[in-house]
């Protein structure tokens, strides 16, 4: 049960981070556009890793709540590291954010 609560806290932290980022973008959109694009790329990579891992480990003997908990944390850290170097999505996402902001301010 403790691991479930810890995972819940991690999810809440990530949600709070995204909500804080939304607030910052509203107040100073140009400053936080790149950070937002990087975070979206990181979330995409994390979802990609999770989907790949789920397709491989469905009937694993070592599959347990604890292993899923640590795997989730590992995937989150790996996705952040991969996103630092980028997979090419940040630039595309940034263009979309800028296009939305330009249309919003017209």
UniProtKB/Swiss-Prot annotation:
UniProt keyword annotation of Transmembrane present: no
Pfam families from the UniProt entry: Rod-binding (PF10135)
Keywords tagged on the record: Bacterial flagellum biogenesis
Coiled coil, from the record: none
InterPro entries: Flagellar_prot_FlgJ_N
Keyword Heme in record: no
Top-level taxonomic group: Bacteria
GO BP of this protein: bacterial-type flagellum organization
Miscellaneous comment: This protein is shorter than other FlgJ proteins and lacks the muramidase domain. It may be degenerating and may no longer be functional.
Family designation: Belongs to the FlgJ family.
Protein name: Putative flagellar protein FlgJ homolog
């Amino acid at each position: 049960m403790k691991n479930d609560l810890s995972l819940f806290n991690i999810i809440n932290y990530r949600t709070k981070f995204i909500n804080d980022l939304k607030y910052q973008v509203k107040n100073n959109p140009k400053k936080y556009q790149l950070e937002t694009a990087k975070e979206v790329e990181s979330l995409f990579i994390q979802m990609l890793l999770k989907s790949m891992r789920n397709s491989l480990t469905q009937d694993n003997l070592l599959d347990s709540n604890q292993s899923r908990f640590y795997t989730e944390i590992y995937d989150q850290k790996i996705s952040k590291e991969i996103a630092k170097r980028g997979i090419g999505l940040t630039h595309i996402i940034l263009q979309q954010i800028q296009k939305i902001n330009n249309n919003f301010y017209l």
